[in-house]
C-alpha cells in the first residue's frame, strides 16, 4: 500500500465519537493552550515511522500548538488543523472565540513554515491527528484542514490527498488545484466542502478566484469564495473565519 494510503487508514482510526456522558467525563479542562512534543516512532511505531524517514527522521522531535475550545458543549469537538507560513503553529488570539463557538480543537505544527519542504509540512499536518488522539477526544466526522498563504497551498494538497480524513478545508490567500496523479480518490474529494477565503486587496485574489472556479468546473459544487472587503494578504478576523467554518459545517453530521 502507498504510504499516503497507509497513513490515511491509520488516521481514520484515530477519531473517537463518544456518548455525552463519556465525553464529559474524559475530556480535560478546556479553553486552554496546550503543547505536544513527540516523534514519528512514538506515534507510528518503528516500522511505519521508517517509511517516512526521508521526510522526517525517526528520532526528530515534532511539536504542535493546541487550543482546546472553552464551552459547555457535551459533544466531542471537531478538529481544525492549521498550516502556518511561519515557524510557529500557535493560534492567533481572535480565533480562540471561533474555536470556542464552533467547538473545534485547534492544532498547528511548529517549524512548518514556508521554508520547510512541502512533504514534511504535509506529514506534520496529518500526524497532528495522531498526536491529538493520544491525548484528547474528538469527533472524526468533523475534521477541517486550513492554512494561510503558502500554508493554504499545502492545505489544498492535504485536502486532496486525504479526502477521507478531512471533510472540509479553508484556504486563506493561497490554494492550488489538485493534481490527479497525486489524488487517489477524486470522487471523494468532490463530496467535501471548501472555502476560498481572500481579500479585495490580496495580491492572490485573482489566483484564488481562478482556483475556486477550477474546483467548480471539476465538480466540487460545495465550494464557496469568500472575499473580505479591504483585507490584504492577511488572516481573517473572527467573523469571517466563522462564516467559512459555518459553511463547512453545513455538511457535517449532527
Language-model segments: which ranges?
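Bacterial N-terminal signal peptides
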Residues: 9-19
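A domain-start/cap signature at the N-terminus of enzymes
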Residues: 23-78, 211-213, 223, 253-254
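Gly/Ser-rich "nucleophile elbow"/oxyanion-hole loop immediately N-terminal to the catalytic nucleophile
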Residues: 70-76, 117-149
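Active-site glycine-rich loops that stabilize anionic/oxyanionic intermediates
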Residues: 84-88
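Short amphipathic alpha-helix adjacent to the substrate-entry channel of hydrolases
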Residues: 90-107
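Primarily recognizes the serine-hydrolase "nucleophile elbow" in alpha/beta-hydrolase
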Residues: 141-190
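The feature captures the conserved acid-bearing segment of alpha/beta-hydrolase catalytic domains
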Residues: 174-245
Amino acid at each position: 500500500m502507498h504510504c499516503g494510503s497507509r497513513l490515511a487508514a491509520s488516521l481514520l482510526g484515530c477519531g473517537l465519537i463518544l456518548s455525552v456522558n463519556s465525553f464529559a467525563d474524559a475530556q480535560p479542562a478546556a479553553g486552554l493552550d496546550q503543547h505536544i512534543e513527540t516523534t514519528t516512532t512514538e506515534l507510528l511505531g518503528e516500522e511505519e515511522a521508517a517509511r517516512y524517514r526521508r521526510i522526517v527522521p525517526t528520532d526528530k522531535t515534532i511539536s504542535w500548538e493546541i487550543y482546546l475550545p472553552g464551552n459547555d458543549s457535551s459533544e466531542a469537538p471537531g478538529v481544525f488543523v492549521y498550516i502556518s507560513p511561519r515557524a510557529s503553529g500557535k493560534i492567533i488570539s481572535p480565533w480562540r472565540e471561533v474555536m470556542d463557538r464552533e467547538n473545534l480543537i485547534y492544532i498547528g505544527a511548529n517549524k512548518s513554515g514556508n521554508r520547510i519542504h512541502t512533504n514534511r509540512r504535509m506529514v506534520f499536518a496529518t500526524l497532528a491527528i495522531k498526536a491529538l488522539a493520544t491525548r484528547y477526544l474528538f469527533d472524526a466526522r468533523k475534521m477541517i484542514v486550513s492554512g494561510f498563504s503558502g500554508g493554504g497551498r499545502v492545505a489544498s494538497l492535504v485536502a486532496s490527498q486525504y479526502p477521507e480524513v478531512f471533510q472540509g478545508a479553508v484556504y486563506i490567500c493561497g490554494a492550488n488545484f489538485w493534481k490527479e496523479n497525486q489524488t487517489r480518490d477524486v470522487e471523494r474529494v468532490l463530496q467535501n466542502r471548501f472555502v476560498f477565503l481572500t481579500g479585495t486587496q490580496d495580491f492572490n485574489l485573482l489566483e484564488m478566484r481562478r482556483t475556486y472556479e477550477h474546483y467548480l468546473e471539476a465538480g466540487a459544487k460545495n465550494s464557496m469564495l469568500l472575499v473580505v472587503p479591504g483585507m490584504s494578504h492577511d488572516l481573517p478576523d473572527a467573523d469571517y473565519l466563522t462564516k467559512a467554518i459555518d459553511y463547512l459545517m453545513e455538511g457535517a453530521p449532527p
